[in-house]
Amino acid sequence: MNRTFSLRRKVKKSEISTPSNFEHRIHAGFDARSGTYTGLPKQWQALLGPPRSISRPKPMVDPSCITPVDVAELKTVIRGPSSSFRYNSPLPFGMTNSPMPSVARSNSLRISATASPVVNVSSARHSFRPTLPPVSQRGYPFNDPSYAPLPLRNQKPPMSTTFGVEKPHQYQQIITIVAPSRTTTPQLQPKSPSTPQAMRQQPKCTEGVSDEEFRNALKFVVDGTDPRSDLTDYKQIGEGSTGVVEAAYKISTKQIVAVKRMNLRKQQRRELLFNEVSILRQYQHPNIVRFFSSHLVDDELWVVMEFMEGGSLTDIVTATRMTEPQIATISRQVLGALDFLHARKVIHRDIKSDSILLKRDGTVKLTDFGFCGQLSEEVPRRRSLVGTPYWTAAEVIAREPYDTRADIWSFGIMLIEMVEGEPPFFNDQPFQAMKRIRDEHEARFSRHAKVSVELSELLSHCIVKDVNKRWPAKDLLRHPFFAKAQHSSSIAPLLLQLQGNTINGNNPPTHHHSSQITTVIQ
């Protein structure tokens, strides 16, 4: 025994050599200015997802108060780096020999974050949830245990609402087939903060229609032709939770078009597909993005629309400084589209710079109609909480009945965007911003903003909590400020300046805020 121990003590440990031919290929760092990691391998960066500062706030739907006729769910705003959209070519004012001229993001051509940011909400808040499908099937923000709707003041039971229109249209009848109205709105009762386990135990709602029934209903609002024979040279320029967006060359008209491709079987709420298609199909206006056609291709819905090569207004407000004549020129066109919609009792409910697209000649057009609401004599106001928090009207956040003038509040916030580069309270988390919008005084231009008396007065007619004092779009168009408006071509220098920043490697600056999540509340 002793001999054995002595032998063990004499055994020499093998020496481990130092590393040889060592190469340090990864040099990770942290950029404090942008709040992002640098030098990470692509696989690691994919796990982290894109930084919050790249993503614009993304609409989300509050399930606690949904009018039965409203079909608005979580909408992914497709958005991406400006350098990825332009086919690596300059922005000419004339067509080139190539069938694919230089283009910028357009018509919801915005790439969304692959990993949705988490809304930071105190777990002490109560959660109000009606009978809805399990959160595991509904995705962000519903499967986030920290998510809860905004607490209300003097909450009253929601009124039951039925859908009615003055002049029924075919698409509205189809929507009734797909998403039949309930006679009463579910009563909302407070619950303790939900844990992931409790959320998984929620009862499951049965689907109203089968895949085949939905497909048959959708055939009433789409063209019966196959668009693939007339489209070529596809180039994916966007991707979101509803599908992908591609630029394509339309052979018959020899033009670039935007094609949204949405898989019917992968939609969290398929009936939402009716909303944008129906609005674009029915309403044509010089300042509304042009709709060409929609098609059922296998299990996908294809929507072919005008390609807006100038990009979104967001690119301009974050990268350039606009003059008041340029602000007036853009605002006049936006109000023209709103006046057209409001005269037809349509509420857009998501007015912001992301929803405003431009042509290369400076023409401004309104897009993103997935959250529209239709009013009628039977339903003169809506109650559903819909909108992007920083732009949402105070009465919408307070869940009071609202009408088309809710869009005017959002338009006023967009005026502040064009002057200051971002909406008020953008440093706050979405729900904190909503509380401030609801409880504090109306937002105004900052003291450092050098604006004219006319522009300040215009803003005061838009952002006012007394809805009766808020001017409609047709009255705003007659405001003295719009005497400064010029021809749409006056916007072209902004697009050239934006293009120059991209060519020189200076991408348009993004808002570096932790609250870079867009929150839309329905």
Curated annotation (Swiss-Prot):
It is an enzyme of class 2 (transferase). Divalent cations such as magnesium or manganese. ATP binds at residues 237-245, 260. One of its GO terms (molecular function) is protein serine/threonine kinase activity. This is Serine/threonine-protein kinase pak-2. GO terms for biological process: cellular response to starvation; intracellular signal transduction; nematode larval development; regulation of MAPK cascade. Serine/threonine-protein kinase which plays a redundant role with pak-1 in embryogenesis but, in contrast to pak-1, is not involved in commissural axon guidance of ventral cord motoneurons or in distal tip cell (DTC) migration. Keywords: ATP-binding, Kinase, Magnesium, Manganese, Metal-binding, Nucleotide-binding, Serine/threonine-protein kinase, Transferase. The keyword Manganese applies. Belongs to the protein kinase superfamily. STE Ser/Thr protein kinase family. STE20 subfamily. It comes from the Eukaryota. Expressed in pharynx, vulva and spermatheca. Unlike other p21-activated kinases, expression is not detected in neurons. Residues 183-208 are annotated as: Disordered. InterPro entries: CRIB_dom, CRIB_dom_sf, Kinase-like_dom_sf, PAK3-like, PAK_BD, Prot_kinase_dom, Protein_kinase_ATP_BS. Disruption phenotype: Low level of embryonic lethality (< 15 percent) which is suppressed by simultaneous RNAi-mediated knockdown of max-2. In pak-1 and pak-2 double mutants, defects in embryogenesis and L1 stage lethality. The few animals reaching adulthood are smaller but have normal ventral cord commissural motoneuron axonal guidance and are relatively coordinated. Residues 183-204 have a biased composition (Polar residues). It catalyses: L-seryl-[protein] + ATP = O-phospho-L-seryl-[protein] + ADP + H(+); L-threonyl-[protein] + ATP = O-phospho-L-threonyl-[protein] + ADP + H(+). Residues 231-482 form the Protein kinase domain. Its EC number is 2.7.11.1. The active site is at residue 350. One of its GO terms (cellular component) is cytoplasm. Its cofactor is Mg(2+); Mn(2+). Residues 16-29 form the CRIB domain.
